[in-house]
Amino acid sequence: MTASSNDDDLIFECYSDPELKRWTHLANAKAWKGILTVQQYADREQLLGSSEISQKNKSNEMMTKYPKSYQWLGQKYFVLKDRSLPDNGKFSQVVSSCETLNRIGYCIHPGSNGKIEPALIVCIGGVFTFENHRGKGYAKKMIIKLNEFYDKIRDDANTVLELKNLVINLYSEVGEYYSALGYESMHVPLHRISKLDELTERYCGEDDDHDGKYLGFDDYRGLVGLHETQFKESLLSLHKENPEKFVFTVAPDFDIFTWFQYRDLFIMNKSGRKAQQNLFFGYALSDNSHIIWHHNWNGDSLIIVKIHIPEETFQRKELKLKKLLRKAIEETKLHGLQELEFWDEEIPIKKYPQLFQLLTELENESKVFSENGSISAVRPPKGYTAEQVIWDNNTKFCWF
């Protein structure tokens, strides 16, 4: 029996069984384990699933702030079962699986009267069909049912704004596969820099910052709090320019950054690398301008997750950008990584002519604007087309 021949046999479930989670992660490890072993990958997924952002539905703060929706926050797990298959084991009828990481976001739209409203931002990940069940349309059926699952939550929201404003997005590693399922690509190119010494010498200049500080694992909550104002100002500005559009962003949250750090440290420790001394996760200047990064041990690169520079004159902003990039380059080299990487929406290089010109001189065009292996895609909210949606902060920051 195939998925397309009898949909009545297909059962879509949201589950919490830890044994099933482990089973699905052991099965899909081959696709995403990178330099880890299968067991290590499953261990990492268990660790990430128990992180603060993944367990947000258990947060007292969220329960108080969002009493009618907190249960939908955090990481959720789903499977598709085919009951026409032999029932000869606990998971023998499971054919596909996926997960979502649900976070609070903000939005502004024509019906919000110029006010920013909360939104539940649902990000799909881990879409996987088990090897012996491929080619039967199961993944497509699962995503259709996932769409329906979250549509019902939105449609039953009544006056709960964050549920009424629910948005689903994903990061596709299979090109435009999800376009047939209602997801519109919003690709953001990557910038991959390998000529680190040249960039330091010709763009960043001398290290004259003596009052800044490196960021450890959990000592920069106050800095992330600064993103709140910047994010909301950006939404209001985009709304003013595009009053007819639905503009949204994932909200800043310190727990998003620690999620990256858990990944970072786990892979470092399991990959056979020596324990890295003086491992930092970012740098802040004395005025609280700062950069937060992620050591991508799998890809031998340092990825800029977020950069925050208070709005000033362009000249002063670029001066601070140079200082922060210098610190990122130093971190890249210190730990033997080969490239510095960032998304164009994080640092739109064409807005910095000096940086853009230098990168085009130093690097091959395929690195200056590299195709992103994780294509951002969004399912437009009810009543909007893709052209009427703006995804702000569409960067590594909200990747899952």
UniProtKB/Swiss-Prot annotation:
InterPro entries per record: Acyl_CoA_acyltransferase (IPR016181), GNAT_LYC1-like (IPR055100), LAT (IPR053013)
Pfam families in UniProt: GNAT_LYC1-like
Biological process according to GO: regulation of cell size
Signal peptide residues on this chain, from the entry's feature table: none
GO cellular component: cytoplasm; nucleus
Remaining remarks: Present with 768 molecules/cell in log phase SD medium.
Entry protein name: Uncharacterized protein YGR111W
Organism: Saccharomyces cerevisiae (strain ATCC 204508 / S288c) (Baker's yeast)
